[in-house]
C-alpha cells in the first residue's frame, strides 16, 4: 500500500515533469530504457532549460545549449548499455512516459533523426546532422493554455519513420516542449533518444539538416512565446519536417520551421486534423500570465 501511494504521488509529480523510457512498435512495448538512452540526472523527470535562465530554475545543472539538449544529460554514457531497435522504414515508433505520467504542460511534440557515422549508433554522441520527421502543436478549440495542445494529457509521442529513409543506424530524438513559461524566456525541454536500425529503407535524401544544440536558441520566437494572451500560431523551433522525398536541403545553421500550429509529418504518417487552430478557443479570452516566480507556477503544482 505504501508503495502504491508513493508511486501514485510520483506519477502526479511527473505529470508536471516527465521523461520517456519505453518504446512501442507494432503494439510491442519494450522494457524501461531498453532502447532509449537513460540520462544520468539526479531526478530523471526534470526539464532542460537554457543556461541564460535564472540559476535557481536550472535543475541538475542541465542546460540545453551546453549539450544536454541533444539526448539529455549524460545519455551518451549509457549508449553501450542500450539496445538497438530494428524498425522498418514506414513503421511508426512510439515513446511512452515513465511512472504512469502524462504530459500536462502546454506545448508541441517533435521528433528528429540523425544517422550514425559508420552505422554504429552505440558509438554515436549525436553531434552530427539531424532532420525533423514530426511536429504537432494545437489540435482543436480547447483552452490554449492547456488542452488545445495535441499532446495535452497524453502519455506518449508517435512518429513514423519516413518510407524514404535510407537503411542504417540512427538516433531518433523525441521531444516535448513545455511553453507555459516561454513568456519569461524559460521553455522546458523533455528530450529522449532511441537507438534504432532502419531496415527496408528507401533512397531519400533527408533534410533540411541542423545540429543540436545549435538548432535552438533562447532568442527564438518559441522561447519567447506567450500562451496567455489568446490563441495564435505557434512558431515551431528547428527546420521544416522532411517530406520523405529524394531531396532535402542542407543547412549548417538553424532553419526555422514555418509558423503554424498544425500537426506535420512525412506523408507516410497520418496527421491529426487541425480543427480551427487559428481560431480563438471557445471561452479562452486573453489571460494574464502567472506572476508566481519559480519554474512552473502555482497552476502547475500537482501534489
Where are the regions a protein language model picked out?
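A short tyrosine-centered beta-strand micro-motif
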Residues: 170-174
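Peripheral, solvent-exposed domain-edge segments
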Residues: 2-109, 113-156, 180-303
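Surface-exposed loop/turn positions
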Residues: 91, 168-169
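Beta-strand-rich extracellular modules
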Residues: 175-179
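A glycine-anchored, Pro-Gly-centered beta-turn/N-cap motif
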Residues: 161, 166-168
Amino acid at each position: 500500500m505504501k508503495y502504491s501511494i508513493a508511486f501514485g504521488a510520483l506519477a502526479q509529480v511527473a505529470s508536471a515533469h516527465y521523461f520517456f523510457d519505453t518504446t512501442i512498435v507494432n503494439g510491442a512495448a519494450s522494457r524501461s530504457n531498453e532502447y532509449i538512452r537513460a540520462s544520468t540526472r539526479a531526478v530523471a523527470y526534470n526539464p532542460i532549460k537554457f543556461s541564460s535562465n535564472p540559476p535557481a530554475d536550472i535543475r541538475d545543472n542541465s542546460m540545453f545549449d551546453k549539450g544536454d539538449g541533444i539526448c539529455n544529460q549524460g545519455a551518451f554514457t549509457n549508449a553501450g548499455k542500450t539496445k538497438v531497435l530494428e524498425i522498418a522504414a514506414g513503421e511508426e515508433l512510439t515513446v511512452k512516459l515513465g511512472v504512469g505520467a502524462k504530459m500536462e504542460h502546454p506545448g508541441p511534440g517533435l521528433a528528429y533523426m540523425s544517422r550514425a557515422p559508420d552505422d554504429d549508433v552505440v558509438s554515436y554522441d549525436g553531434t552530427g546532422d539531424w532532420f525533423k520527421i514530426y511536429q504537432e502543436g494545437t489540435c482543436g478549440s480547447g483552452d490554449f493554455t492547456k488542452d488545445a495542445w495535441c499532446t495535452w494529457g497524453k502519455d506518449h509521442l508517435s512518429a513514423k519513420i519516413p518510407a524514404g529513409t535510407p537503411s542504417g543506424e540512427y538516433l531518433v530524438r523525441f521531444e516535448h516542449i513545455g511553453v507555459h513559461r516561454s513568456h519569461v524566456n524559460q521553455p522546458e525541454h523533455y528530450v529522449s533518444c532511441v537507438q534504432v536500425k532502419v531496415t527496408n529503407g528507401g533512397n531519400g535524401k533527408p533534410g533540411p539538416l541542423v545540429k543540436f544544440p545549435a538548432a535552438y536558441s533562447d532568442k527564438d520566437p518559441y522561447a519567447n512565446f506567450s500562451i496567455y494572451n489568446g490563441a495564435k500560431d505557434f512558431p515551431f523551433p528547428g527546420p521544416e519536417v522532411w517530406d520523405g522525398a529524394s531531396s532535402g536541403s542542407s543547412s549548417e545553421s538553424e532553419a526555422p520551421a514555418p509558423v503554424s500550429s498544425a500537426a506535420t509529418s512525412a506523408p507516410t504518417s497520418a496527421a491529426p486534423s487541425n480543427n480551427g487552430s487559428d481560431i480563438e478557443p471557445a471561452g479562452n479570452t486573453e489571460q494574464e500570465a502567472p506572476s508566481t516566480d519559480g519554474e512552473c507556477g502555482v497552476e502547475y503544482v500537482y501534489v
